[in-house]
């Protein structure tokens, strides 16, 4: 059994994942660009029953580019996003790939909203 631990910069909220991710997705949507302050976001999606969250987290819900609501959980202390729950996929929890702090983590298997990809970013998976 795989155990992975994700945390924010200061370690307050955590997400422990007991299985391999169902998928790892690189998202170029404008909302992810704004949320991360980067040109894309990368999420590892895990079956909900395999994720245990702990510590204080502040929630923020917004409509996604797909039209479904998504609730983000971030640290009230350092502001880092650790995980989120997409209404479109209620059986999954998304965890920010960078929150694992593991350079050997699985590479993304798909790219979405590639029409918003910055031209200087290499295409990556399926895009």
Language model: regions and residue ranges:
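A short Gly-Trp-Pro
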Residues: 1-127
């Amino acid at each position: 059994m795989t155990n992975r631990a994700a945390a924010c910069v200061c370690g307050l909220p955590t997400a422990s994942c007991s299985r391999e991710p169902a998928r790892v997705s690189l998202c170029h949507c404008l909302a992810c660009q704004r949320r991360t302050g980067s040109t894309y976001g990368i999420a590892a999606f895990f079956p909900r029953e395999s994720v245990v969250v702990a510590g204080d987290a502040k929630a923020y819900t917004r409509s996604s580019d797909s039209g479904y609501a998504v609730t983000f959980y971030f640290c009230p202390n350092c502001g880092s996003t650790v995980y989120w729950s997409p209404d479109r996929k209620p059986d999954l929890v998304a965890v920010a790939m960078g929150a694992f702090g593991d350079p050997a983590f699985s590479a993304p298997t798909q790219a979405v909203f590639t029409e918003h990809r910055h031209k200087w970013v290499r295409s990556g998976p399926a895009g």
